[in-house]
């Protein structure tokens, strides 16, 4: 009997697609409309695919198959983000070269993806570890190295939009005369300090016990190495940085035109952290009043300088209206002014504090919950608005990488400053008070009434007297204790004082960003080598000057190494490479040494979407004409975990290439969708009291008493209960809850968790494909619910869609025959009106659902069609063939088999998508629900377009409705044509 047999059908069609290169997009520029659909390509781990991967891949595959059938040129590709830590860690443990491990893992991933029938153009496949690929990763890095950002340059791009700020060739950087006069080396150092790719001393995670630098993800929250649980300390190493901060404004503002989820846009904006405020200089020169006054007079003449000198500490604040409340200053321990500001008697304390701060991560330092620590430098600064001298402290909650690395501390109006002031008994001066309407003021102590004063500038408001603050007041209000600004509303005060500071030459309006430059180097082997030479002096020591590797010498290929053990020092692993790779001498005798850091895993994934459009080009990273045709990516689907870093880094690289004229689009990804997570199957837990009696989960809460040895307790008594793991046959669904089969009053706890090895709930797609077939897996993952939502796995759900595919097969195939042939009910007869209506409604609904990425509802429509047609004694071929085309994007193997059975000799991959006829969808009658007091009690059929009177009359005459109305008083009848009839009744 020719039953539906996925294990026979699917390998057959996968081989057919491979042999006929069905989904290959020919090289060159095609005619017609394009559709570039891209998955976030995976890291090929040793674990292979899990069932979460195919969710996004199936969604993009449906879109691509649908687009091909619409006649569009589709670019749909797959590759491998294959540099990374796991392969190198495996090499350290086993001695197996990372390349061997990576290639083995890629082979497994490719096998799994092909078994799922995705319509990738495999001729464009590449891995970021391919030298032919990372040659161009290195080339793009050199474009960053060759670029400086002209913040004042106004220009119009190929998209017709005018922007301010542009990346320009380093050769166009204006060189000051004094730098030119100092010679070539000085000019080169000046250029190096302005490049988008530059070197800078940055703290890294150094583990002495392991003898290596660790990535942040390899360090636990307790500051220990993930491997071995060894102490990790922070050390400064010279690192490569990318000046992403230069593009902060454009990265933030140009999100607006992208079709991305609002949540992702918000995450990126928050990460960039744009804020409006003011820069203010606090005087640290002569401690005398005369010195301060002389400085202010000079500033009034010369204005606010672009860069601060040694006489000031420059701060950035979003609340210039609180300047009068600054009672101390805080510098980051790494601030360059700390050494000269620290007095002799404070030197030992400051040095020890800086040493301890250097051991902490930025995350630990800025943790709001941690105890505030700090040390006084012994020096003072003068507040420019009131001449008050305030002490200068250092504290680790201030980061040198944010703002200016110095803050004015206003403890009355900032939570961290308040906690610090309380810890060290520093003054707290309130300078902003809340504005309270007189009608809402309640004064219990009538003696306080004499202290209330009216605010003439805000009629109806009063000033509430200052009381000792129990916490920082961080809201807006009006100014107090702020000299001539008293009484001004916060927003007005901000505007006024920014202008006054500018006029006095001690401050100015400013924009700041939380975003920091991108630390771009790693001390690893398995990453792209930097295409950079360091120049050495005659003794072999670095001169501090660097030069780019010539384009003709790219790629700089990773050297063959057998020893992947850490060096035991902060030197990168590549420092152990053979000398013939490490060193060279130029024709004019300059000694060179290669950069021995490697690029991070992010590098290769920053631009892979460009290479897919032209993967075999040996002359350019992408042909200009192909870039113009294929870019931007029309639909990009991937996990929300990449919402910030990967997407931000890709956008940054793309904008630099855009500025340099290498690409014509300002953004890489026009539409972004984050698929939801597929969770493990729900875990069912019941609860028993001390007597073994079942209690409802609704009467139980998690135990918060550490002294009690129990995970859960009774909500009302706090007595412990025992959690019991239940099996599926012990429970049943009742409404929104799961209950015990033996006692339906007992609600059990049902929770789905992220799939993980530790929970033992990981599902391997190979197992599903083997048992049910790839089409069932694809269909189930799309049927689980909306694409963007998290959804729990259910084997019964897989079984359900498998049965649906079996029904679709039987609808067309005669399972009673000895060989596969059409069901006798399938006939070459014209469809009747009802059959045409079912078909065209399904065509319309499925197409619209695919356009909206609402795949679960599209599948529901096809299930409805199958149920309706299966009930027909005669099934016109004219409605079945279009249905097979609708099914094709979702279950392509089955669709191809049925298409062939209908006598077609070529793949349906490029068959035209069925078109619906609006005239065939209209019905002569429509079904309208009838409600009694808002609850549906019956349904009636009325002519299409029936008016209110017809609706009411038909409903009143319906026997079912009459039964519900009997003995009741009809107060009102609401009839909405085409929608509903509602009887409002009494009695």
Residue ranges and their predicted role:
Residues 1-34, 332-335, 344-347, 427-444, ...:
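Basic, alpha-helical terminal appendages of large translation-related enzymes
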Residues 1-38, 68-77, 101-107, 260, ...:
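Conserved oxyanion/phosphate-binding beta-strand-loop segments in alpha/beta enzyme cores
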Residues 4, 277-279, 433-461, 466-468, ...:
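Long, charged, mostly alpha-helical binding arms that flank functional sites
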Residues 26-102, 126-137, 317-318, 322, ...:
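N-terminal catalytic cores of NTP/NDP-binding nucleotidyl/phosphoryl-transfer enzymes
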């Amino acid at each position: 009997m020719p039953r539906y047999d996925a294990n026979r059908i699917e390998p057959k069609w996968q081989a057919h697609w491979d042999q006929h290169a069905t989904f290959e997009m020919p090289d060159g520029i095609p005619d017609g409309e394009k559709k570039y659909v891209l998955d976030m390509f995976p890291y090929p781990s040793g674990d292979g695919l899990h069932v979460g991967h195919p969710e996004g891949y199936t969604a993009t595959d449906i879109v691509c198959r649908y687009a091909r059938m619409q006649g569009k040129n589709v670019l749909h590709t797959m590759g491998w983000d294959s540099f990374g830590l796991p392969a190198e860690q495996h090499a350290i443990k086993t001695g197996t070269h990372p390349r061997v491990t990576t290639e083995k893992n890629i082979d497994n991933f490719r096998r799994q993806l092909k078994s799922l029938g995705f319509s990738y153009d495999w001729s464009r496949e590449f891995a970021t570890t391919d030298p032919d690929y990372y040659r161009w990763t290195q080339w793009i890095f050199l474009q960053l190295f060759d670029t400086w950002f002209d913040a004042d340059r106004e220009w119009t791009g190929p998209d017709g939009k005018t922007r301010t700020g542009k990346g320009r060739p380093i050769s166009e950087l204006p060189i000051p005369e004094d730098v030119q006069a100092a010679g070539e080396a000085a000019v080169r150092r000046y250029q190096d300090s302005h490049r988008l790719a530059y070197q800078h001393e940055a703290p890294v995670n150094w583990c002495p016990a392991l003898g290596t630098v660790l990535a942040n993800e390899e360090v636990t929250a307790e500051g220990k190495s993930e491997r071995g649980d060894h102490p990790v300390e922070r050390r400064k190493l010279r690192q490569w940085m990318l000046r992403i901060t230069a593009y902060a404004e454009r990265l933030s503002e140009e999100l607006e035109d992208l079709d991305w989820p609002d949540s992702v846009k918000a995450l990126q904006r928050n990460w960039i952290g744009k804020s409006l405020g003011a820069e203010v200089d606090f005087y640290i020169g002569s401690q005398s009043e005369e010195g301060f006054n002389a400085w202010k007079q000079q500033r009034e003449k010369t204005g606010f300088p672009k860069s601060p000198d040694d006489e000031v500490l420059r701060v950035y604040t979003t609340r210039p209206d609180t300047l009068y409340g600054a009672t101390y200053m805080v510098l980051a321990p790494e601030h360059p002014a700390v050494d000269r500001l620290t007095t002799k008697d404070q030197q030992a304390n400051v040095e020890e504090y800086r040493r301890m701060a250097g051991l902490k991560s930025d995350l630990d330092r800025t943790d709001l919950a941690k105890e505030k620590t700090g040390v006084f430098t012994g020096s003072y600064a003068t507040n420019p608005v009131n001449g008050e001298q305030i002490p200068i402290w250092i504290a680790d909650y201030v980061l040198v990488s944010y703002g200016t690395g110095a803050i004015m501390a206003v403890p009355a109006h900032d939570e961290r400053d308040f906690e610090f002031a309380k810890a060290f008994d520093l003054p707290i001066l309130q300078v902003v008070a809340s504005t309270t309407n007189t009608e809402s003021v309640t004064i219990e102590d009538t003696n306080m009434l004499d202290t209330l004063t009216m605010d003439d500038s805000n009629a109806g408001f009063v000033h509430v007297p200052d009381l000792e603050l129990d916490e920082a007041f961080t809201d807006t209000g009006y100014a107090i204790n702020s000299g001539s600004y008293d009484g001004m509303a916060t927003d007005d005060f901000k505007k006024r004082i920014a202008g006054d500071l500018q006029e006095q030459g001690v401050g100015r309006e400013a924009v700041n960003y939380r975003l920091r430059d991108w630390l771009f180097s790693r001390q690893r082997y398995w990453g792209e080598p930097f295409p950079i030479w360091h120049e050495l002096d005659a003794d072999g020591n670095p001169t501090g000057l660097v030069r780019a590797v010539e384009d003709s010498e790219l790629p700089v290929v990773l050297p063959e190494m057998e020893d992947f053990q850490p060096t035991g020092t902060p030197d990168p692993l590549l420092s152990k490479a053979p000398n013939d790779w490490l060193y060279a001498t130029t024709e004019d005798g300059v000694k060179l040494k290669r950069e021995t850091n490697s690029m991070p895993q992010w590098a290769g994934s920053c631009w892979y979407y460009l290479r897919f459009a032209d993967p075999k080009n040996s002359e350019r990273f992408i042909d200009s004409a192909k870039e113009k045709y294929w870019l931007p990516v029309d639909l990009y689907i991937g996990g929300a975990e990449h919402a910030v870093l990967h997407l931000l880094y890709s956008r940054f690289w793309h904008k630099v290439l855009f500025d340099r004229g290498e690409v014509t689009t300002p953004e890489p990804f026009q539409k972004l969708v984050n698929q939801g997570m597929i969770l493990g199957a729900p875990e069912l837990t019941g609860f028993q009291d001390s007597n073994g009696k079942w209690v409802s989960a609704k009467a139980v809460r998690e135990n918060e008493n550490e002294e009690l040895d129990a995970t859960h307790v009774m909500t009302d008594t706090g007595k412990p209960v025992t959690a019991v793991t239940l099996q599926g046959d012990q429970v049943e669904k009742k409404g929104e809850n799961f209950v015990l089969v033996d006692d339906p009053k007992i609600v059990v706890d049902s929770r789905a968790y992220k799939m993980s090895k530790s929970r033992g709930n990981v599902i391997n797609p190979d197992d599903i494909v083997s048992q049910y077939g790839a089409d069932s897996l694809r269909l189930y993952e799309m049927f689980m619910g909306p694409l963007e939502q998290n959804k729990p796995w259910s084997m019964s759900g897989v079984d359900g869609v498998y049965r649906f595919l079996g029904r679709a097969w039987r609808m067309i195939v005669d399972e009673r025959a000895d060989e596969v042939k059409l069901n006798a009910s399938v006939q070459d007869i014209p469809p009747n009106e009802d059959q045409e209506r079912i078909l065209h409604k399904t065509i319309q609904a499925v197409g619209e659902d695919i356009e909206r990425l609402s795949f679960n509802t599209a599948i529901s429509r096809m299930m409805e069609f199958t149920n309706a047609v299966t009930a027909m004694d005669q099934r016109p071929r004219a409605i079945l063939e279009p249905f097979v085309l609708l099914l094709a994007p979702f279950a392509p193997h089955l669709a191809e088999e049925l298409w062939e059975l209908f006598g077609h000799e070529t793949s349906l991959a490029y068959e035209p998508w069925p078109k619906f006829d609006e005239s065939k969808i209209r019905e002569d009658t429509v079904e309208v629900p009838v409600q009694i007091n808002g609850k549906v009690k019956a349904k009636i059929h009325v002519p299409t377009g029936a008016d209110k009177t017809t609706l009411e009359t038909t409903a009143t005459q319906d026997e079912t409705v009459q039964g519900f109305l009997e003995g009741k008083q009809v107060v009102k009848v609401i009839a909405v044509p085409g929608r509903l009839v509602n009887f409002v009744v009494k009695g």
